[in-house]
Amino acid sequence: LLTGCGSDESEPSTPPRPQPSEVEYPEVSEDQRVSITTSLQNKDHVQICAHRGYWKDAPENSVKAVTLAIENQIDMIELDVRTSKDGEMVLMHDTTIERTTNGTGKVSELNYKELLSYNLYHDGALTEEKIPLFKDILLAARGKIYIDIDVKISDYKAVYNLVKRYGMLSQVLFTVYDVSTARKVINLDRNAILLPVIYEMQDMENYLAVCKPLPVAQFNSAAFTEDILAKASGNGVSLFKNI
């Protein structure tokens, strides 16, 4: 069972992050921890997933939100991935940055250098946290916490390739909202671990036909019914529920 929770730029206090042209993506060895699939087989342990990281004490989708989740021994974090104008994968839930930063504009219409010039809010207060690169989050989380990736872009392949490059495929869930997207991910790698969102019984049946074995699925409130849950249990599907 998984349950989801929901500066002065002229004199920066910390060294600036690399600009897009300088971003490096090192090869790393495979993460040897127990896979999510194996971990979910422990039915005596309710795993906690921190939605957008540990946002209670840090900006959502930030490096600090990830490190605090690790420090508080959370089992998993959920993160949202988008792409900047110049093709860098960053963390941001919304299509625009107004709600979470002191900047304006769509993520897809801003270069990473522009995104980096803004700071993230937490509880209405501006912090020193910046919009992080997805790869920085993977490196911070690697070997320490599982990840549920809510991919907000159509290019699942780019996200998959980076996760694979960092040896984390057994540690990551890919959230999917429809069967066609599930097929795209499966075509990339039959062993990729999907987290389909279930709205009705037909969804459960469709995903089982495409993804079986299906280790876990997320159920919205309308799908949280006895017959759908029985169908999931009978097919070895663990429950993921936002509360």
Where in the sequence are the language-model features?
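Sec-dependent bacterial lipoprotein signal peptides
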Residues: L1-T3
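Phosphate-group recognition and catalysis centered on beta-loop-alpha active-site segments
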Residues: C5-I243
